[in-house]
C-alpha cells in the first residue's frame, strides 16, 4: 500500500454538543488524524468525561437515493412521451397530484430511513483524572460527509496532517484528459488533440461545492436530533448508575456505624485498662516524704539543733536524721532524693519521687561538693549540704543558677550498693 504524503498540519477544536465538520468544504483535501487530546479545563460543574464521537452519512443510503431518483426520472420521462395531455388545466392538476404523492412518499421514506442515514462511532473517552489523550490513525477523504461531536464537560482537540493520497494524481489526470482521443498528447502542449479536446476547457470545472452538498453535509436538524439522543442516553445511564449506587451507599453507611460502635467500645475498654494500670503504678511507685523540717531548714528547737561540720573547701554538712547500716564510701553507688536551693531560698532542682538519682560516689560524676558532702551517710539518713561556688558550678551560669552561686541541698540516701 502506498504511503500517504503529509502536506500540512491539521488541527480541529470541538466544543461539547457542537457538531463540527471534519473537513472544510472550501479545502477538499484528505485528512489523517493521529491524536485526540482533552482540554483539562471543565466548561461546567459536572466534570463529565468527554466522549468523542464520529457521525458519518451512510454511503449506502446515498447510493439507494440516487438509484431511486434515477429510476423515478426514467419512469416519468417514459410516461410523458407515451401520453401528452390535451389541455393545460388537466396537466396542472396532474402535476399537483404527483407532487403531493411524491411529498407523502418522501415523508414516509424519511421516517423509515432516518435511523439508517447516519452512522455513529465512538472514537475515545477522555478525562483529566484518567486519560488526557488518545492516539488515532484515521484517514478521512473529502468525499466522506463526516462530523465530530463531543459529549461531556470538556473540549477536545484533534491533530494530524493534511495528506496527499497516492491516487489523487491519477484521478486528476483522468479528469483533465476526458474528451481526448487515444493519441492525446496533452503533455506535449496539447499537440495532436482534436477540435473537441477538453484539456483547456476549464469553464466546466468548478471547485466550489454545490449548495445541495453543503446543505446535506450540514443538515443541522438531523445532527441535533442525534446529539439529543446521545444526551438522553447518557442521562439515563447516569440515573441507572445512581439508583444502583444508592443501596451500596446505605450498606456502607450501616457498616461504618457498626465499625464506629466497635471502635468506641474498644476505646472505652482501653481507657479502663489504662486507669487500672495507672492505679497499679501509683501503688508500686515509692514516694519518699521529706520531713517538714528538712525542707524548711534546721529545727528551731534548741535541743534538736543538728550538729554542723565544715569539710574540705568550706563544704558545710548538717545531719538531720542519722541513717542505719554501713556508711557510704568512695566507689559505692548511692541513690539520692534531694531538693536544691539558691542562697535566697529559691528551688532550682529537686528529685522527691519516681526513680532516685543514682551516681558513683567519689568518681567526679557530680559536682565536687556532692562527692564530699554525701560521703559517710547511711541508708535513711537525711543531711543538709551547703556548697560554696568553687565546689559547685563556679563561674559557670546554668538555667536557674547564676554564676558564682552558693548552693544548698537537702538530701536523703535511699539506696546504697
Curated annotation (Swiss-Prot):
One of its GO terms (cellular component) is chromatin. Residues 42-129, 191-307 are annotated as: Disordered. GO terms for molecular function: peptidyl-prolyl cis-trans isomerase activity. It comes from the Eukaryota. Its EC number is 5.2.1.8. Residues 236-249, 256-307 have a biased composition (Basic and acidic residues). Residues 331-417 form the PPIase FKBP-type domain. This is FK506-binding protein 3. Coiled coil: none annotated. It is an enzyme of class 5 (isomerase). It catalyses: [protein]-peptidylproline (omega=180) = [protein]-peptidylproline (omega=0). It holds the Pfam family NPL. Residues 61-84, 99-120, 197-222 have a biased composition (Acidic residues).
Amino acid at each position: 500500500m502506498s504511503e500517504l504524503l503529509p502536506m500540512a498540519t491539521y488541527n480541529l477544536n470541538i466544543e461539547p454538543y457542537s457538531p463540527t465538520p471534519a473537513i472544510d468544504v472550501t479545502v477538499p483535501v484528505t485528512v489523517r488524524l493521529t491524536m485526540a487530546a482533552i482540554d483539562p479545563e471543565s466548561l461546567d460543574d459536572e466534570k463529565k468525561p468527554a466522549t468523542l464521537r464520529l457521525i458519518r452519512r451512510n454511503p449506502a443510503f446515498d447510493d439507494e437515493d440516487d438509484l431511486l431518483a434515477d429510476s423515478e426520472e426514467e419512469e416519468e420521462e417514459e410516461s410523458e412521451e407515451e401520453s401528452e395531455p390535451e389541455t393545460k388545466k388537466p396537466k396542472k392538476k396532474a402535476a399537483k397530484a404527483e407532487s403531493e404523492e411524491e411529498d407523502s412518499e418522501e415523508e414516509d421514506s424519511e421516517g423509515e430511513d432516518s435511523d439508517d442515514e447516519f452512522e455513529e462511532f465512538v472514537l475515545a473517552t477522555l478525562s483529566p483524572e484518567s486519560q488526557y489523550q488518545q492516539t488515532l490513525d484515521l484517514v478521512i477523504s473529502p468525499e466522506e460527509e463526516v462530523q465530530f461531536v463531543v459529549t461531556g464537560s470538556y473540549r477536545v482537540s484533534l491533530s494530524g496532517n493534511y495528506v496527499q493520497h497516492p491516487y489523487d494524481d491519477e484521478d486528476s489526470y483522468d479528469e483533465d484528459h476526458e474528451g481526448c482521443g487515444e493519441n492525446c498528447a496533452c503533455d506535449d502542449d496539447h499537440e495532436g488533440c482534436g477540435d473537441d479536446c477538453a484539456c483547456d476547457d476549464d469553464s466546466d470545472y468548478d471547485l466550489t461545492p454545490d449548495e445541495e452538498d453543503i446543505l446535506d453535509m450540514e443538515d443541522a436538524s438531523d445532527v441535533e436530533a442525534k446529539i439529543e439522543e446521545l444526551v438522553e442516553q447518557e442521562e439515563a445511564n447516569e440515573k441507572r448508575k445512581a439508583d444502583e449506587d444508592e443501596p451500596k451507599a446505605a450498606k456502607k453507611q450501616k457498616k461504618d456505624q457498626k465499625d464506629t460502635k466497635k471502635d468506641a467500645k474498644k476505646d472505652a475498654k482501653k481507657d479502663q485498662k489504662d486507669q487500672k494500670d495507672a492505679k497499679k503504678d501509683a501503688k508500686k511507685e515509692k514516694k519518699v516524704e521529706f520531713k517538714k523540717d528538712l525542707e524548711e531548714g534546721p529545727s528551731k528547737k534548741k535541743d534538736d539543733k543538728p550538729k554542723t561540720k565544715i569539710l574540705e573547701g568550706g563544704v558545710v554538712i548538717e545531719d538531720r536524721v542519722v541513717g542505719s547500716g554501713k556508711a557510704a564510701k568512695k566507689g559505692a553507688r548511692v541513690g539520692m532524693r534531694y531538693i536544691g536551693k539558691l542562697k535566697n531560698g529559691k528551688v532550682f532542682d529537686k528529685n522527691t519521687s519516681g526513680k532516685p538519682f543514682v551516681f558513683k560516689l567519689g568518681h567526679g560524676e557530680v559536682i565536687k561538693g556532692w562527692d564530699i558532702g554525701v560521703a559517710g551517710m547511711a541508708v535513711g539518713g537525711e543531711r543538709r549540704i551547703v556548697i560554696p561556688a568553687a565546689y559547685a558550678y563556679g563561674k559557670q551560669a546554668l538555667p536557674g543558677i547564676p554564676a558564682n552561686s552558693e548552693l544548698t541541698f537537702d538530701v536523703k540516701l535511699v539506696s546504697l550498693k
